[in-house]
């Protein structure tokens, strides 16, 4: 299942037991967040996970930011 055409996230029970991954890869989206949390730059993440494009990573982060803004507005 693709989350949205605009968001490059895929969830498929056959891929990493259904973990959210970057579309077209087996890289979990959580890997991006985990790496950023410990101080890895976006450039380093892309270098370490070459199947994920910069555009994909940025679009996912923008989606999360938008979702947080929506939650804030709803509160």
Task: Describe the predicted segments one by one.
Residues 2-43:
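A short, structured beta-strand/loop element
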Residues 28-75:
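Long, charge-rich, low-complexity alpha-helical segments
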